[in-house]
């Protein structure tokens, strides 16, 4: 800035004017060469606050060394324009210019920094206020180059000096201020803060983020420690964030409210319904108004009532669901459970009721609690009427169903279904006449099997001993047990039978054909004497008490008093009949009484019928205990004694006529029965060491095949099986097919008087020969690269075997490999396949 010298500075000194006439000094040119002084009317209407603000401003900016006293002139230090003594010359920014305007007169002009030039004590205060405001608003200082340019360019200053009665007041005017009262009030407040309060500078507010408004009440820390204050602040911030995120969290209370206020469109409960298909009218109780709330509560109460009603209905109808499958498989769950074919129809219902309590879990708590509620009359009757199906009908349906077990070849039969164990009474003539193959349905009779068919009782076939023989399953036939023929105690044959275990002799013809036996020779079992233990039932189902207890005596008709027996004894008696244990004592007694009645009837019935009149036509020699179970050589077969005992006759072989016409042979047997007049002294040796085993009657099937004749001559071992007595009035037992293919024993027959005895040629087992022939087959050459498997390879690969082809190959090629002259029938080959577990079938069904 150029220096104008002392002459120029003299013009800035304020003129001495009277106290009544204020003067406005205006600097027009930048060179400060001219000065125009305009007199202003001293208006008494100046606002009081404006005048007061000016006075306070002057007092605040006054210096202690230079007090401002009215009507006193002070010496001034002349400094350069815009400068202050001992300070840096700073330019005045354009925004800092002030304009003091009168509301009545707007023609006044302002002049800045004139007071600093005229008076030394006014300029420093003005500069301090401006610099203080610059620091607060814009902390960054401009550069020195910018300061010099602004000093040269913006050098025009305006101001107003007011002189009161004794004081001279100079007030700068700001252009930007439009309301002078607000401007002076803010200036007065800033002066007070700079003067005495010394407050801290306010921090600048961040514009890029606004904190969340704290709606919680501020917690007051009584301790006032800075650590607690910081912890409270952090806790408040964390609470704010939790409250913000709590709206997105899962609330269990809201879910319960939705479930309580939810109302389905359909009354019926739904299962497996997606959320998209749920009704849209599910609302909480908070969102519903008073009317919908009332309707919702009523609907929910009705819905809850319906649900409770359905639950009550389920509890009332809660019972064990018994299906046909469960009843069918329930017979084979326990070893003591009897077969359904051997249970009388009168005890079927009792058996089912005894099975059902065993399946239910015991509930001791319910039994210990006393029943306070009384039974409502009529509820049991309604429950009985509303039962879906009675149990007896389901059981009758089970009894009529054919339960078949085995492979496909075993199930492929052409006979009637009653052959498979559906008819318990095999003694009827119509069943025997209609069925081609008479197969016993009892497990004990399953030991006697023919060459062409086996017992179809899977459980009986599975029970074998170590030697391969079939075991007797303890089954009690409560319907029609066969009485046992017991010899007299004084008979000498009883002692002879125990010594003759290795061979049996042929009795004479009269004893073989038999005649009617006296009632004294046939002794009935004592059904009521003694207690039947479980060990007795495990030995044999048809073995009765000892002969010493079953002698001629009156039958006791009085029923035993089961009430005096203890519960374990009753359980043992019940187990002896083949039933499962029952919890209720009354039920056990009732079941035992019914069993006793049915057993008494079965014991009394044979007294009105003739006893077994005929003895077997064929006497069988047993196999030694150490014999092989499957196949035996010809050397192991036991030959009959060459010298027959006294009173016996010589046998003869079965002729082809008798084989081809079994009806004729049976007719001749009946004729011999009638023609025989002399009773025999020696009873047939059919009892053996085991009292329950009786000799088996062999019936030769009607066939014209010569191969069948040769196969019938093979040695077999027929273990005698107990046969049931027919209910018909016939005087003889219908023959049964019972031959074991894996056992060998010579068959001895009787002949007329005068014929010579012929020794039976022992031949190897035909089944063993079939096995050897199949294994001896050489490998077949491949045809066009395709291998041709042998019969043994087909069997190993579980290929189905055509019986026709295998029989043809055995008769043509197979037996020649092992030098066997006999031939076999397809039915015999099928029997061999079934004994080996081979799947086989006929190519052309007949």
From Swiss-Prot:
Segments for region (Disordered): 1-20, 84-111, 123-164, 283-322, 480-513, 624-690, 723-751
Pfam families for this protein: Slx4
Nucleus among keywords: yes
Post-translational modification: Phosphorylated in response to DNA damage.
Compositionally biased intervals (Basic and acidic residues): 141-153
InterPro entries for the chain: Slx4_ascomycetes (IPR027784), Structure-sp_endonuc_su_Slx4 (IPR018574)
A GO CC annotation given for this chain: Slx1-Slx4 complex
Basic residues composition bias: residue spans: 306-318
Location (main, coarse): nucleus
Record GO biological process: DNA recombination; DNA repair; DNA replication
CDD domains linked: SAP_SLX4 (cd22999)
UniProt keyword Nucleus present: yes
Molecular function GO terms recorded: 5'-flap endonuclease activity
Biased composition (Polar residues): 293-303, 657-680, 725-751
Disulfide bridge map: none
Assembly mode: Forms a heterodimer with SLX1.
Function, in words: Regulatory subunit of the SLX1-SLX4 structure-specific endonuclease that resolves DNA secondary structures generated during DNA repair and recombination. Has endonuclease activity towards branched DNA substrates, introducing single-strand cuts in duplex DNA close to junctions with ss-DNA.
Family: Belongs to the SLX4 family.
Name this protein carries in UniProt: Structure-specific endonuclease subunit SLX4
Species of origin: Arthroderma otae (strain ATCC MYA-4605 / CBS 113480)
Organism classification: Eukaryota, Fungi, Dikarya, Ascomycota, Pezizomycotina
């Amino acid at each position: 800035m150029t220096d104008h010298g002392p002459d120029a500075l003299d013009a800035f000194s304020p003129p001495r004017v009277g106290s009544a006439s204020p003067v406005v000094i205006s600097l027009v040119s930048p060179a400060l060469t001219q000065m125009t002084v305009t007199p202003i009317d001293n208006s008494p209407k100046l606002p009081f606050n404006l005048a007061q603000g000016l006075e306070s401003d002057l007092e605040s900016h006054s210096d202690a060394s230079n007090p401002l006293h009215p009507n006193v002139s002070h010496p001034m230090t002349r400094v350069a324009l815009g400068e202050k003594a001992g300070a840096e010359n700073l330019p005045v920014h354009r925004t800092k210019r002030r304009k003091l305007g009168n509301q009545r007169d707007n023609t006044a002009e302002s002049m800045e920094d004139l007071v600093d030039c005229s008076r030394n004590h006014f300029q420093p205060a003005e500069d301090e206020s401006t610099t203080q405001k610059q620091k607060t608003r814009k902390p960054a200082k401009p550069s020195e180059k910018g300061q010099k340019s602004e000093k040269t360019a913006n050098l025009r200053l305006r101001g107003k000096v007011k002189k009161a009665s004794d004081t001279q007041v100079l007030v700068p005017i700001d252009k930007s201020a439009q309301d002078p009262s607000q401007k002076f009030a803010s200036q007065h407040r800033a002066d007070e803060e700079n003067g005495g309060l010394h407050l801290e500078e306010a921090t600048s507010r961040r514009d890029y983020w606004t904190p969340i408004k704290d709606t919680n009440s501020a917690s007051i820390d009584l301790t006032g420690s800075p650590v607690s204050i910081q912890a409270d602040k952090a806790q408040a911030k964390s609470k704010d964030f939790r409250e913000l995120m709590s709206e997105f969290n899962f609330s269990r209370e809201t879910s319960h409210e939705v479930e309580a206020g939810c109302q389905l469109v359909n009354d019926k409960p739904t299962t497996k319904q997606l959320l998209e298909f749920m009704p849209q009218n599910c609302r909480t109780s908070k969102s519903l108004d008073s009317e919908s709330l009332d309707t919702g509560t009523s609907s929910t109460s009705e819905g809850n009532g319906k649900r409770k009603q359905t639950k009550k209905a389920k509890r009332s109808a809660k019972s064990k669901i018994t299906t046909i499958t469960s009843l069918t498989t329930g017979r084979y769950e326990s070893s003591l459970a009897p077969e359904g074919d051997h249970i009388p129809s009168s005890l079927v219902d009792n058996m089912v009721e005894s099975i059902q309590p065993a399946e239910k879990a015991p509930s001791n708590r319910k039994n210990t609690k006393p029943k306070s509620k009384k039974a409502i009359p009529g509820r049991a009757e309604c429950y009985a009427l509303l039962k879906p199906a009675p149990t007896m009908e389901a059981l009758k349906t089970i009894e009529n169903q054919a339960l078949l077990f085995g492979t496909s070849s075993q199930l492929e039969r052409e006979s009637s279904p009653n052959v498979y164990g559906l008819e318990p009474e095999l003694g009827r003539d119509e069943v025997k006449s209609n069925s081609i193959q008479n197969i016993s349905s009892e497990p004990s009779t399953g030991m006697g099997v023919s060459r062409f068919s086996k017992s179809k009782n899977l459980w009986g076939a599975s029970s074998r001993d170590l030697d391969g023989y079939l075991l007797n399953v303890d089954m009690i036939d409560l319907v029609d047990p066969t009485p046992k023929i017991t010899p007299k105690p004084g008979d000498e044959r009883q002692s002879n039978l125990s010594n003759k275990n290795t061979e049996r002799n042929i009795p004479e013809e009269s004893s073989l054909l038999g005649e009617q036996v006296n009632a004294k020779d046939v002794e009935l079992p004592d059904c009521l004497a003694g207690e039947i233990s479980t060990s007795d039932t495990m030995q044999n189902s048809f073995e009765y008490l000892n002969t010493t207890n079953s002698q001629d005596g009156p039958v006791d008709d009085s029923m035993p008093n089961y009430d005096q027996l203890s519960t374990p004894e009753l359980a043992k008696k019940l187990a002896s009949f083949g039933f499962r244990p029952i919890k209720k004592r009354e039920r056990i007694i009732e079941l035992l009484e019914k069993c006793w009645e049915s057993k008494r009837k079965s014991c009394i019935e044979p007294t009105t019928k003739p006893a077994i009149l005929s003895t077997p036509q064929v006497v069988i020699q047993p196999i030694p205990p150490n014999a092989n179970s499957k196949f035996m050589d010809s050397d192991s077969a036991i030959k009959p004694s060459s010298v027959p005992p006294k009173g016996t006759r010589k046998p003869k072989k079965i002729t082809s006529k008798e084989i081809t016409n079994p009806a004729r042979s049976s007719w001749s047997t009946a004729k011999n029965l009638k023609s025989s007049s002399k009773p025999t002294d020696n009873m047939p040796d059919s009892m053996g060491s085991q009292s329950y085993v009786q000799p088996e009657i062999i019936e030769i099937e009607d066939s014209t095949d010569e191969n069948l004749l040769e196969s019938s001559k093979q040695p077999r071992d027929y273990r005698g099986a107990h046969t049931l007595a027919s209910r018909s009035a016939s005087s003889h037992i219908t023959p049964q097919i019972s031959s074991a293919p894996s056992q060998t024993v010579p068959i001895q027959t009787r002949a007329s008087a005068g014929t010579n005895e012929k020794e039976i040629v022992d031949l190897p087992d035909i089944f063993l020969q079939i096995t050897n022939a199949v294994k001896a087959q050489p490998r077949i050459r491949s045809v066009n690269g395709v291998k041709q498997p042998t019969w043994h390879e087909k069997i190993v690969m579980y290929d189905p075997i055509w019986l026709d082809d295998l029989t043809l190959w055995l008769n043509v090629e197979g037996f020649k490999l092992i030098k066997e002259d006999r031939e076999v029938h397809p039915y015999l080959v099928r029997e061999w396949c079934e004994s080996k577990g081979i799947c086989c079938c006929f190519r052309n069904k007949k």
